[in-house]
């Protein structure tokens, strides 16, 4: 029989509490949740209040234009369009003419480009003639007094391509571009027989006439045999050397080696190209290098000194590198035997690895006992907690009374062990 749990001292926190929470999602109940929490709580929607800039605005909604007609008409005219935005004033909706607009004063009225669109956006000829006059119709030959303009030398423009020099210093012609009036000439219909011009056959330019003599692609005939694909610049060397694979048809000759021929490799068939055709061709050389290398030993032709017996071959002696070095025999009695052949690399980069018994480290003497770490020192009852089975009753005694009652109300099987005498096994 388990004893009664300690209730503890009654505190204002316990008095204000509404008891343990039965919701498993609220296992870690806080003081605020137990004191002020309510089930199905929904926050109330507050009213939106304007910021401090709201008082700076003029109440345009309640403003009427007739309020300033008597009191302050000047201010009424200034703030007449304050309620309209710039976008609504500039981008007004499309207005279609309904026939109530007044007639224009002039039939050829000039409007801006931002006005009502016209079918013909170009200017009318009558409007152009008011500003410009055609020198072909009203030039110096037609109207007296319109002679070519003479500009003083000081005011003349020295730059090339000036439009004021065209058409007798009257500017470009009427409704023509600068290019048409300056550079395009009318070709005569009748042939000019007096100039005695003859037109020959069409020839290639310098860029294409000598294209076959390109030093990169073209080679002179002396550098290649007739029929060599190098002579054809349009054909690449890759296509001429790497031909497609051809399967045997059955009519090919069998690979038979003729009697008395050299077993040369495929590299021996080399066509040597003469750089200078005037130089005579050298004597035929053996084609294969392996044929000369792998030959049986032959007796060399003796010289006159060898025939007279004046040539002698001595014993083989060591070279200067081995003759100057004494015989290296390591003696166990030498103290500096390791320093005898000490190089610069060994002096600068020596080995700091311990040798002998110092190299064994922790493995010397068998397995070392484990030392307690920071985690083991901070937990005094580490072995007791890991070995023993947790007791719910002892856990409730060490907890806060309110937390203990909450655990007992949420889980009724938490207090006693499942296999205790309180829960007998069913037979």
Swiss-Prot record:
GO cellular component, one term: axonemal A tubule inner sheath
Pfam families: PPP1R32
MF (Gene Ontology): phosphatase binding
Annotated region (Disordered), positions in chain: 82-105, 273-298, 314-335
Subcellular location: Cell projection, Cilium; Cytoplasm; Cytoplasm, Cytoskeleton, Flagellum axoneme
Amino acid composition bias (Polar residues), ranges on this chain: 287-298, 321-332
Subunit structure: Microtubule inner protein component of sperm flagellar doublet microtubules. Interacts with PPP1CA.
The protein's name in its UniProt record: Stabilizer of axonemal microtubules 4
């Amino acid at each position: 029989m388990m004893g009664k749990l300690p209730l503890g001292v009654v505190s204002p926190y316990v008095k204000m509490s509404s008891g343990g929470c039965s919701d498993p999602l609220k296992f870690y109940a806080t003081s605020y949740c137990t004191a002020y929490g309510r089930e199905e709580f929904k926050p109330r929607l507050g009213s939106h209040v304007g910021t401090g800039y709201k008082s700076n605005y003029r109440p345009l909604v309640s403003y009427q234009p007739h309020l300033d007609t008597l009191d302050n008409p000047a201010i009424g005219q200034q703030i007449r369009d304050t309620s309209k935005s710039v976008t609504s004033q500039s981008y007004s909706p499309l207005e279609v003419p309904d026939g109530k607009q007044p007639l224009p004063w002039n039939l050829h009225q000039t409007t801006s480009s931002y006005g009502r669109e016209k079918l013909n956006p170009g200017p009318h000829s009558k409007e152009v003639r008011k500003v410009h006059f055609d020198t072909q119709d009203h030039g110096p030959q037609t109207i007296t007094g319109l002679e070519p303009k003479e500009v003083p030398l000081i005011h003349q423009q020295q730059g090339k391509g000036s439009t004021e020099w065209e058409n007798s210093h009257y500017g470009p012609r009427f409704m023509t571009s600068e290019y048409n009036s300056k550079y395009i000439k009318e070709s005569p219909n009748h042939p000019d027989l007096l100039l005695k011009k003859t037109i020959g056959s069409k020839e290639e330019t310098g860029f294409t006439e000598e294209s076959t003599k390109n030093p990169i692609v073209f080679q002179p005939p002396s550098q290649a045999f007739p029929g060599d694909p190098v002579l054809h610049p349009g054909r690449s060397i890759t296509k001429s050397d790497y031909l497609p694979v051809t399967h045997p048809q059955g009519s090919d000759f069998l690979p038979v080696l003729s009697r008395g021929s050299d077993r040369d490799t495929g590299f021996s068939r080399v066509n040597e190209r003469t750089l200078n055709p005037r130089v005579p061709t050298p004597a035929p050389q053996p084609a294969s290098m392996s044929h000369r290398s792998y030959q049986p030993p032959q007796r060399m032709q003796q010289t006159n000194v060898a025939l007279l017996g004046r040539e002698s071959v001595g014993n083989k002696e060591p070279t200067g590198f081995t003759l100057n070095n004494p015989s290296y025999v390591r003696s166990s009695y030498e103290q500096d035997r390791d320093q005898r052949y000490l190089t610069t690399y060994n002096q600068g980069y020596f080995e700091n690895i311990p040798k002998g018994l110092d190299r064994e480290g922790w493995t010397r003497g068998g397995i070392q006992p484990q030392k307690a770490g920071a985690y083991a020192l901070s937990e005094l009852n580490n072995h007791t907690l890991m070995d023993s089975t947790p007791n719910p009753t002892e856990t409730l005694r060490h907890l806060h009374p309110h937390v203990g009652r909450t655990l007992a109300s949420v889980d009724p099987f938490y207090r006693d062990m499942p296999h205790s005498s309180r829960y007998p096994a069913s037979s």
